[in-house]
């Protein structure tokens, strides 16, 4: 089955690579319209997925990731329209010039070809990936989690209808709809057809892909994110940022999981934090350095376990640790962070610059929430993933991350001397 999907996707990719920006945008507009026109069908499929997932004991965090509502689906359709408004990177000349030999050379952006994406209970990923791939002239082979197979099937059906309506092959966007896990292993060996693989899921999936894939893999999306409250931080705005970073949507990978507090501000800051977290329904997991100050506050507090510093909670849970100085804060982030998103709250430019330079994450913030690590927030449109590695892309992966380049030389019967 996968062999035939790969053959069809590769053939479709050649056709997509030749489309103009106008033609690609027509497809995307059609997809957005069809998503809205067939909302009831997609939501019906999603309701069946939700019912099965709840019966199977999925956590509330996972159920939130899985759920679609009319508002969320409308937002997904609007995200597709936003991709239409983005500049098409394909064909863009990156650099070049006239060489001494008389050869005029340029480096031009081109599609990667076929993108494979393996993801878990995130039905919006289906549309996000499809829209970004189509905008950049790439075909896509998608393998969603078994929790979302009905939703994914309904969504891909809509996308394929739009493709065919525009005279393009349905194979430009395909989904593996079988829940058979053996197919994941088979997909990882499809380097003959798939040019880049992106896993979006837990640490186990990323490890599997890194160890078994013969396809270049972009990993990321696991967010053990930190906020360091410097001794010069102003408490009211700091609390506002922390509430946003923890509670706005706890199931996302850019949610803060560990709070590091400078000891010189801890006596004043921790009681205020406890009050705010109690109001927000957040359970605090406190290090011995923070536990005495937090135990007397209104927030629910538990002693933190060492392994919890490596946990991506995706829930209303927050580790709290008092540190001696920035050295200890940076050392903690280096040991337990996932190079996703980390922030410092400070009023000292010197401290801000040091944190920026020494914390090696894909996104580093000064006096801002970690929740901004998102393609839409960065002005990239929808994102295909957040990469926490350094090759070939880093941070939210927008359109440019789905392209490569080729060197083109223009001569006038030019030969090498």
Swiss-Prot record:
Compartments (UniProt record): Cytoplasm
Main localization, broad class: cytoplasm
SUPFAM superfamilies, alphabetized: ALDH-like (SSF53720)
CDD domains the record matches: ALDH_F18-19_ProA-GPR
Recorded GO CC terms: cytoplasm
Keyword annotations from UniProtKB, A to Z: Amino-acid biosynthesis, Cytoplasm, NADP, Oxidoreductase, Proline biosynthesis
Origin superkingdom: Bacteria
Catalytic activity, as annotated: L-glutamate 5-semialdehyde + phosphate + NADP(+) = L-glutamyl 5-phosphate + NADPH + H(+)
Annotated EC: 1.2.1.41
InterPro entries, per the entry: Ald_DH/histidinol_DH (IPR016161), Ald_DH_C (IPR016163), Ald_DH_N (IPR016162), Aldehyde_DH_dom (IPR015590), G-glutamylP_reductase_CS (IPR020593), Glu-5-SA_DH (IPR012134), GPR_dom (IPR000965)
BP GO annotations: L-proline biosynthetic process
Transmembrane segments: none
Pathway given in the UniProt record: Amino-acid biosynthesis; L-proline biosynthesis; L-glutamate 5-semialdehyde from L-glutamate: step 2/2
An annotated Gene Ontology molecular function: NADP binding
Protein family membership: Belongs to the gamma-glutamyl phosphate reductase family.
NCBIfam families associated with the record: PRK00197.1 (NF001221), proA (TIGR00407)
Purpose of the protein: Catalyzes the NADPH-dependent reduction of L-glutamate 5-phosphate into L-glutamate 5-semialdehyde and phosphate. The product spontaneously undergoes cyclization to form 1-pyrroline-5-carboxylate.
PANTHER family: DELTA-1-PYRROLINE-5-CARBOXYLATE SYNTHASE, GLUTAMATE SEMIALDEHYDE DEHYDROGENASE
HAMAP family: ProA
Protein name (database record): Gamma-glutamyl phosphate reductase
Species annotation: Klebsiella pneumoniae subsp. pneumoniae (strain ATCC 700721 / MGH 78578)
Gene: proA
């Amino acid at each position: 089955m996968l062999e035939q999907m790969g053959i069809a996707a590769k053939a479709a990719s050649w056709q997509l690579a030749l489309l103009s920006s106008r033609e690609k945008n027509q497809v995307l507009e059609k997809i957005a319209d069809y998503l809205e026109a067939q909302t009831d069908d997609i939501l019906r499929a999603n309701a069946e997925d939700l019912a099965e997932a709840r019966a199977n004991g999925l956590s509330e965090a996972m159920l939130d990731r899985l759920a679609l509502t009319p508002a969320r689906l409308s937002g997904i359709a609007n995200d597709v329209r936003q991709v239409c408004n983005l500049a098409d990177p394909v064909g863009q000349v990156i650099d070049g010039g006239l060489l001494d030999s008389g050869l005029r050379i340029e480096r031009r952006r081109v599609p990667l070809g076929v993108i494979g994406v393996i993801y878990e209970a995130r039905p919006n990923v289906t549309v996000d990936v499809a829209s970004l791939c189509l905008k950049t002239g790439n075909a896509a082979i998608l393998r969603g989690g078994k929790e979302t197979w009905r939703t994914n099937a309904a969504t891909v059906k809509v996308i394929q209808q739009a493709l065919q309506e525009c005279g393009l092959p349905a194979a430009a966007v395909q989904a593996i709809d079988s829940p058979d896990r053996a197919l994941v292993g088979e997909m990882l060996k499809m380097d003959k057809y798939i040019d880049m693989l992106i896993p979006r899921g837990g640490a186990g999936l990323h490890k599997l892909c890194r160890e078994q894939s013969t396809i270049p893999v972009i990993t990321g999306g696991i967010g053990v994110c930190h906020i360091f409250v410097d001794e010069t931080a102003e408490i009211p705005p700091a609390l506002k940022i922390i509430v946003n970073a923890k509670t706005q949507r706890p199931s996302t990978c850019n949610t803060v999981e560990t709070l590091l507090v400078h000891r010189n501000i801890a006596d004043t800051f921790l009681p205020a934090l406890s009050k705010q977290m109690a109001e927000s329904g957040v359970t605090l997991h406190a290090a011995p350095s923070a536990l005495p100050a937090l135990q007397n506050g209104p927030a629910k507090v538990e002693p933190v376990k060492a392994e919890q510093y490596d946990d991506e909670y995706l829930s209303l849970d927050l580790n709290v640790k008092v540190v001696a100085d920035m050295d200890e804060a940076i050392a903690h982030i280096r040991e337990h962070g996932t190079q996703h998103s980390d922030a410092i709250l400070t009023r000292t430019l010197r401290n801000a610059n040091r944190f920026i330079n020494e914390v090696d994450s894909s996104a580093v913030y000064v006096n801002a929430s970690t929740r901004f690590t998102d393609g839409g927030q960065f002005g990239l449109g929808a994102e295909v993933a957040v990469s926490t590695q350094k090759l070939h892309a880093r941070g939210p992966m927008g359109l440019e991350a789905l392209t490569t380049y080729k060197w083109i030389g223009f001569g006038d019967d030019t030969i090498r001397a």
